[in-house]
Amino acid sequence: MTSVVLYTALIGAVLVERLAEQVVSKRHLRWAVARGGVEVCHGHYPAMVAVHTGLLAGAVAEVIWLDRPFVPLLGWPMLLLALACQALRWWCITTLGPHWNVLVVVIPGMTLVRSGPYRWLRHPNYVAVVVEGVALPLMHGAWLTALLFTVLNAGVLTVRIRCENRALATAAA
């Protein structure tokens, strides 16, 4: 098997993981709404989905269309970083439990979670998102995708983090 086939399969596995996140998120949304939860700041979500979808599609497209090689000295460390990002992401999800969602949902009376990775960082999942957005494409030399994702994701995260901070302040009040 060629490295391109293996890389495409890996990106496919990441896509399946993202779909699993959607399933978990829908379950958590039902739980939150049953407790009075309300979704806020939905306007940025389509852009976030587009940027993340573009990351996965763009990485594979760049590798194939621009014939990006797998360079072991860069590829293997990037694979390890991407795996670490997945571990951090699921640590965040399991720490937040039913409070975690891909949407911004405010549940009245709920206290902020300060355990797991939230002991050290207010938004640890976004550390995983930022690092993974560089690691996944660079794993197979797709540096243009890494660069474009980083720029677009910075805009999306700026809006998203402001929204979450407002929501967290409202929930804590």
Where are these regions (language model features)?
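Membrane-embedded alpha-helical segments that form the functional core of polytopic membrane enzymes
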Residues: 7-12, 80-84
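Alpha-helical architecture
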Residues: 16-19, 50, 83, 120-121
